[in-house]
Every structure is written in C-alpha cells, then in structure tokens.
Amino acid sequence: MKNIKLIVSDLDGTLLPYGQENLSENVKNRIRRIIECGVTFTVSSGRTYNELFGFLGEFSDRIYFTCCDGALTVKNGKVIYGRRIENGDIGMFFSKRSDDFSFVLHGAFENYSFGNIPSEAEKYNCIPVRNIFDVKEKIFKITSFGGKISLPDYCGIRTHWDGGDNSVSQYVNRYCNKSTALSDLQMRLMLAKYDTAVLGDRGNDVCMVKNAKYSYCIGNGCVELSDKCAFRFDCGELALDDIIGRL
C-alpha cells in the first residue's frame, strides 16, 4: 500500500529554478511517473491559473492547480475551491487617484486591467475595464503597478507580494493560504497528513508543513522552512526522486 497518495509542490524555486523560463523535461518526466503510479499531484503557487497552465498544461486533466497563494484550486478547467476578493475591497483600487497607478484584476480564467498598465503586464492578455461593474467574474488576486494600497485593518485582503511604492505589489484574500487550500483538497480526496508530501522553498510554503508527514525544503532561502521540514534537497528534481522511491 502506498505511503504517499498526494504530492503538493510549489513552482518557482522548487520545480522551476529561479531565472529559468520553462519547466525542464526531467521535472515533467518525474511528474508523469508520479501520475502513472496513481498518486495525485498538485502544483501550489502564487501564480494565476493561466500562468500555471502555461507550464503544466499537458497535465491539466490529471493534476490539480492551487493558484494565487491558495486563493483557488482548479481541476479540469473548473474551480473546485475559492476565496475571492470582495467587491468592497476591490473598490479601494478603483478609488486610488494617481496617473502612475494601474492594476490587473485576476479572475480564475480572465484578467481585467484598469489604467495604463506597463508592458510587463501585457502577458496577462487583459480585458480593459472602466469600473468594477465591467468585471464579469470573481476576482482572486490583484496586481498593482506604480504604487500600492494602504490596507485598513478591517479590510478582507492581505499583501501577497510587496514590491515597494513604485514597483509591483500583489494582493489576495486575507483568509487564504496554501495550507487552507491543501486542507480543502485533502478533505475532498479523503486523505490525511500521513498520505501527503509537500515541497517548497519560501516562507509562504511553511504553512503547508503541518498538512504533511513528508515535507521537503528546496534550497536554503528560508531558514524557518528548512527547520520545520523533514527533508532538505538542493533542487526539486532530487526531492521528487526521493518521493518516487517511497511510492
């Protein structure tokens, strides 16, 4: 009987080394091997579903995608779990008046832009909007450019990435993280921490460790994660090899 039935892995810095633009065939072959062994594979990342699909689209009907730092999970092109950003919180972005400020609203499958977004945001293939009423789906992440929002204590969002006053910042639902999304998936699959392995490299992966018996820290970029994980490897490929050896 397999000890590991669910594998949840971060993408950037874990499966995808920093500075590398495409997922290596070696990593894809390991994911393919895991699936062939009958184990459920999930990629869990701060990226949007469309971004993750760009890396792992060939597996889209066989794996789960946990996106936007735990804000939603997608399987077979359908959202099975989600913690949206409420319209009242989105309104703070439309209310900010600055010629340099622009932002992108990320839905599960579409992206909406307000203001003159920089060229780096063109990859999102945004639908321009004039106000919140032009947005036709639930929003799970917001990316701002040329400034950031000062979040009041009572609001329902948190900063996922703080790029500073004049750079890129990202926001998600205050109550989402990778652990809550993983807990939901474990419940759906009727699995427990003893069936689960997680891989990560940064602080936002620390919360997943309590959900898994087998925890892997990739690299040395986060001391807290390294201290809490059961295993440490220099790269994601070696960690996947170790997991495959346990199947």
Cite the ranges covered by each PLM segment:
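Active-site phosphate-binding/coordination module
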Residues: 22-119
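Short, structured coil segments at secondary-structure junctions
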Residues: 59-61, 69, 152-155, 211-212, ...
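Active-site metal-binding loops of divalent metal-dependent hydrolases
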Residues: 11, 47, 201-202
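Short active-site oxyanion
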Residues: 38-42, 61-63, 140-142, 194-196, ...
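Conserved acidic, metal-coordinating active-site core of Asp-based
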Residues: 99-211, 220
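Asp-based, Mg2+/Mn2+-dependent phosphohydrolase catalytic module
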Residues: 187, 211, 215-247
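Asp-based phosphoryl-transfer active-site loop
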Residues: 3-20, 209
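Phosphate- and divalent-cation-binding pockets in alpha/beta enzyme and binding domains
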Residues: 51-54, 181, 207-208, 224, ...
